[in-house]
């Protein structure tokens, strides 16, 4: 069975054609700057890369290029299902679902919770339904994995009406990634996932930590929105909620201006005054750049503090997992974080951490305590697998 996985952003469309059983990727790519004259698509297959301009620059045009490439590869008829990443499923969706008109309406109802993401996800689904009208489409939600959190973990200490009437609670994100690396960790450790307590850290431009007990999320660092939690590339992470009122009075900023700054001008970028790119910050820190050193130090401190806190949710920690662009590639972030986590019994294997090739999988801790793992995430494969489960369970021919 071949599954086409689509991730529709506000101005982009990421796609991959995968075999969920073997993990083979036959085609992948990214359409960027959709809605502008500069729209283009990058395709990769059989080790070859190609870039093309997109006339019209729409989601339909991008999917048209995907269809043409599938025809060229002789794979269009092999596609049996389409899996869609959907950022926010609210409280309604705790698992992937077959896309129906009712499901689309429910996703629309979640737009206030994810105004930047869900509208684009909906547009992508509807365009794909036009392009593949006879195939089953499955929605896989970033938030679904965290629906197993207990109420003490997901409720905010705010008026009950805010929760019951407006859905104000912690939802969490990056669920597909956290679920994938937890499963891979169980494979690497050769232990059944239901027996493991893991702390997973998805570290990229967006970053979050998750406490995974027996394969179920029991706490996570992101909340109502992806702004809560860790310091991120350009997002602030946790700040005092009173900051909005203070800046409105002292600086005359509007609510939307403050929110935009917390999302786009803060985090590593705001602290360093330089960049949101961890690679560049590490280089600058080595030359003595004060802002870069502050940003790097604060990122690691807050990450270690959050990971240590997740031990409370688990009670026992069997392992920690680093994933995402920073987690997979930054020896500095991994090493300095693990040094701070000695309180959990973790002991860094400095040689293993230094020797691990960038983007590779491996163990970077010494024996005698919880295991520290580096595992590249593969959200597209996880979406393909979950799509296959839903489609197979509905009796579609695979």
From Swiss-Prot:
The metabolic or biological pathway listed in the UniProt record of this protein is:
Metabolic intermediate biosynthesis; acetyl-CoA biosynthesis; acetyl-CoA from acetate: step 1/2
- Reaction equations catalysed: acetate + ATP = acetyl phosphate + ADP
| Protein name (database record) | Acetate kinase
Give the CC-aspect GO terms.
Answer: cytosol
Q: Which organism is it from?
A: Deinococcus radiodurans (strain ATCC 13939 / DSM 20539 / JCM 16871 / CCUG 27074 / LMG 4051 / NBRC 15346 / NCIMB 9279 / VKM B-1422 / R1)
The protein's superkingdom reads Bacteria
Q: Name one Pfam family in it.
A: Acetate_kinase
Keyword presence, Cytoplasm: yes
Q: Which residues form the active site?
A: 142
In terms of PANTHER family, this protein maps to: ACETATE KINASE
Q: Which amino acid positions bind Mg(2+), per UniProt?
A: 7, 379
Which PROSITE patterns is this protein grouped with? Answer: ACETATE_KINASE_1 (PS01075), ACETATE_KINASE_2 (PS01076)
Q: Which residues bind ATP?
A: 14, 202-206, 277-279, 325-329
Query: Residue numbers for the site described as Transition state stabilizer?
Result: 174, 235
Q: Does the keyword ATP-binding apply?
A: yes
Query: EC?
Result: 2.7.2.1
**One GO BP annotation of this record:** acetate metabolic process
First-level EC class: transferase
Using the UniProt record, give the first listed, main subcellular location: cytoplasm
Regarding protein family, the annotation reads:
Belongs to the acetokinase family.
Q: Which residues does the record give as substrate binding sites?
A: 85
Task: Read off the InterPro entries from this record.
Answer: Ac/propionate_kinase, Aliphatic_acid_kin_short-chain, Aliphatic_acid_kinase_CS, ATPase_NBD
Q: Where in the cell is it found?
A: Cytoplasm
Q: Which cofactor does it need?
A: Mg(2+); Mn(2+)
Which free-text remark accompanies the cofactor?
Answer: Mg(2+). Can also accept Mn(2+).
Task: Tell me, in a sentence or two, what this protein's role is.
Answer: Catalyzes the formation of acetyl phosphate from acetate and ATP. Can also catalyze the reverse reaction.
Keywords, in A-Z order: ATP-binding, Cytoplasm, Kinase, Magnesium, Metal-binding, Nucleotide-binding, Transferase
